């Protein structure tokens, strides 16, 4: 076995392919819908290189665990620290208080290499709210760092106890176990599977196995292997999308593709291309720098603008070059492990400490910042009606809106609470609002968040029972952010499944969801007129944040909207279920899009005024746009 780790041009070109695919995916370039596989490619490369360093050192009896950690710190921390410091300053100038403190939390978790845990608690990688997090991309660095902490110790132990040959077999078993876990957990808990080391470790170990099982092949076979690997990678980029559950078994295609390219180890047009070599050299710094630019354009509503996107891509590589030549290259000169570890640990602790102090200071003294004058976040609680709310064991918003006899019942998730004002402004009497955030209007379902599932089951059962025994003949208006629950491919943190059918997906899931939703609606319709409201349009980002940042940076205001076609595509499954239930249960469908989506655009703001509290909950200004929509619900008095 070759124990000499030399610079490999084919690996450098593979790095370039990985970073280019990720950058173009994040900037929403058509044809790169599967560009997120670039991270999987990076994992394979890291596994190969780290295994080479560790095993070569063990074979020579010269491996130093301290030296290994120092080299990883020297490679990763300086550029990351530079990015975090720049964002700390940028946010100080431009961000509202809550956003700035959220950024500081992300900085701390990123520098402590625990951001994958933080983001896993916030939802799926492809969920819109996380696209506003300036350091979301550091989740992969956290996974790699955690691997770096464990892997050399594991290899040292296996090498000592089993010898190299048996250690290789043990790694094969570990890789297969991690892959099996990834396949299983991707279906049952996709958020965990995406972010966590146990379900990602196999990708890194596969890279290690390429080093441990070197191929002895000729030039022609090497070129064939490289071609097969590149074809697999390109197929992944072109054929996969964020609609696919990831990583799971699908990740085998780019992972094995990357493994083939590395194993081929041949000189070709791919490995000698100067542009790819240059991009590969800059890949880490480009990866770090591109995502904040994506978030900036995303939050300002400019990610669909070709001039801005082009500028963002170019600037990603310019900033990457600056970071590489002025940060990465210079910090590699520190070679003494204790000195390196002490230096980087001190820098990390220093920035984390400064971040924590800054967070506390700006909270108590907002006037010290340039951005302390807030443009005014809209109030979540409506001022269009009086309300009396009641305590309940479900952490739900259970309220009586207005005064007099109850003439309407509003039932659903947080969208029921957020849009209740649109119903109540038509109602001269009172409404009952029953709303529990994150709960689908279903009777028989389950969720991976067992605490939330328990509350949803209790809340729904209680309200369904009350509808059977009370308020007979009173209209019931059903609201729901239905696309959150009805599309099993999204893998968000509110994803539901059905008892005994945990792995149901595709059309089978759609059919089961539609049947369960219809059963719920028909049960209510036995005693009440039922009105089902089609989903409220969801914006791509927080309207308030977008308007605020655009105003501060560009000194101008531009209204935010999405296409009606995008709305229809997102809610296709939900609308299908609603229309099927309405037809079978003799319910009435209410469509908000003629009011919120004039001229083929669904508006998030009007005249610089947000219609939403965030990206999906209407506020008073948005509810007033719906005036007249619910007149049909209110019986004449």
List the model feature ranges, each with a label:
Residues 2-337, 352:
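Membrane-interface helix/loop caps of multi-pass membrane proteins
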Residues 242, 302-307, 317-321, 325, ...:
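Extracellular/periplasmic envelope-modification machinery, especially enzymes
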């Amino acid at each position: 076995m070759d124990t000499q780790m030399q610079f490999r041009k084919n690996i450098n070109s593979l790095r370039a392919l990985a970073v280019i695919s990720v950058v173009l995916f994040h900037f929403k370039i058509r044809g790169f819908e599967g560009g997120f596989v670039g991270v999987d490619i990076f994992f394979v490369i890291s596994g190969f290189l780290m295994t080479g360093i560790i095993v070569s050192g063990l074979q020579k009896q010269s491996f130093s665990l301290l030296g290994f950690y120092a080299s990883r710190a020297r490679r990763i921390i300086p550029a990351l620290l530079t990015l975090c410091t720049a964002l700390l300053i940028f946010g100080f100038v431009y961000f509202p208080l809550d956003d700035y403190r959220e950024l500081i939390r992300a900085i701390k978790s990123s520098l402590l290499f625990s951001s994958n845990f933080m983001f896993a608690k916030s939802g799926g990688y492809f969920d819109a709210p996380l696209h506003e997090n300036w350091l979301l991309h550091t989740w992969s660095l956290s996974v790699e760092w955690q691997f770096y902490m464990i892997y050399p110790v594991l290899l040292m132990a296996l090498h000592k106890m089993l010898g190299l040959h048996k250690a290789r077999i043990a790694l094969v078993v570990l890789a297969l176990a991690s892959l099996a876990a990834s396949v299983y957990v991707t279906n049952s808990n996709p958020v965990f599977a995406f972010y966590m080391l146990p379900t990602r470790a196999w990708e890194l170990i596969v890279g290690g196995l390429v080093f441990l099982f070197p191929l002895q092949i000729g030039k022609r076979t090497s070129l064939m292997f490289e071609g097969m690997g590149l074809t697999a990678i390109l197929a992944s980029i072109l054929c996969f999308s964020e609609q696919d559950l990831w990583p799971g078994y699908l990740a085998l295609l780019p992972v094995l593709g990357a493994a083939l390219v590395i194993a081929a180890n041949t000189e070709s047009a791919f490995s000698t291309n100067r542009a790819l070599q240059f991009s590969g050299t800059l890949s880490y710094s480009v990866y770090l720098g591109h995502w904040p630019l994506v978030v900036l354009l995303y939050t300002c509503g400019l990610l669909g603008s070709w001039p801005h996107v082009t500028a963002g891509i170019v600037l990603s590589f310019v900033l990457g070059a600056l970071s590489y030549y002025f940060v990465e290259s210079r910090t590699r000169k520190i070679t003494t492990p204790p000195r390196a570890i002490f230096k980087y640990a001190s820098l990390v602790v220093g920035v984390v400490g400064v971040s924590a102090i800054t967070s506390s200071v700006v909270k108590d003294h907002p006037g010290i910042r340039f951005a302390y004058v807030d443009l005014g976040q809209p109030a979540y609680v409506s001022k269009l009606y009086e309300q009396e709310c009641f305590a309940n064991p479900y952490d739900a918003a259970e309220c009586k809106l207005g005064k007099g006899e109850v003439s309407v019942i509003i039932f659903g998730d947080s969208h029921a609470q957020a849009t209740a004002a649109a119903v109540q402004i038509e109602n001269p009497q009172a409404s009952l609002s029953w709303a529990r955030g994150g709960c689908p209007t279903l009777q028989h379902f389950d969720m991976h968040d067992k605490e939330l599932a328990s509350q949803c089951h209790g809340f729904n059962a209680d309200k369904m029972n009350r509808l059977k025994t009370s308020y007979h003949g009173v209209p019931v208006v059903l609201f729901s952010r239905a696309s959150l629950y009805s599309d099993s491919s999204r893998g968000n943190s509110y994803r539901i499944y059905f008892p005994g059918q945990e792995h149901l997906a595709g059309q089978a899931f759609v059919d089961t969801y539609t049947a369960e939703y219809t059963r719920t609606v028909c049960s209510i319709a036995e005693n009440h007129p039922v009105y089902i409201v089609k989903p409220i349009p969801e914006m791509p980002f927080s309207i308030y944040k977008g308007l605020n940042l655009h105003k501060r940076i560009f000194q101008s205001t531009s209204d935010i909207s999405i296409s009606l076609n995008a709305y229809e595509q997102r809610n296709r499954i939900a609308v299908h279920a609603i229309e099927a239930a309405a037809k079978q249960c003799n319910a009435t469908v209410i469509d908000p899009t003629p009011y919120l989506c004039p001229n083929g655009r669904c508006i998030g703001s009007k005249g610089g005024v947000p219609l939403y509290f965030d990206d999906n909950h209407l506020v008073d200004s948005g509810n007033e746009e719906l005036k007249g929509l619910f007149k049909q619900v209110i019986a004449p008095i």
